[in-house]
Amino acid sequence: NPVDDHHDDHHDAPIVEHHD
């Protein structure tokens, strides 16, 4: 994902803090 480059386990969603 272009938004969350650290975690790509999520879909193309807005910048949201997912699980660590």
From Swiss-Prot:
Q: Does the keyword DNA-binding apply?
A: no
> Partners and quaternary state?
Homodimer.
Superkingdom of the organism of origin? Eukaryota
Coiled-coil region: none
Keywords (A to Z) from UniProt: Calcium, Glycoprotein
Question: What is the official name of this protein in its record?
Answer: Major extrapallial fluid protein
**Naturally occurring in which organism (per UniProt):** Mytilus edulis
> Region annotation Disordered: residue ranges?
1-20
Name the job this protein performs: Appears to be a building block of the soluble organic matrix of the shell. The protein binds calcium.
GO terms (molecular function) for this protein are: calcium ion binding
The known PTMs are summarized as: Glycosylated.
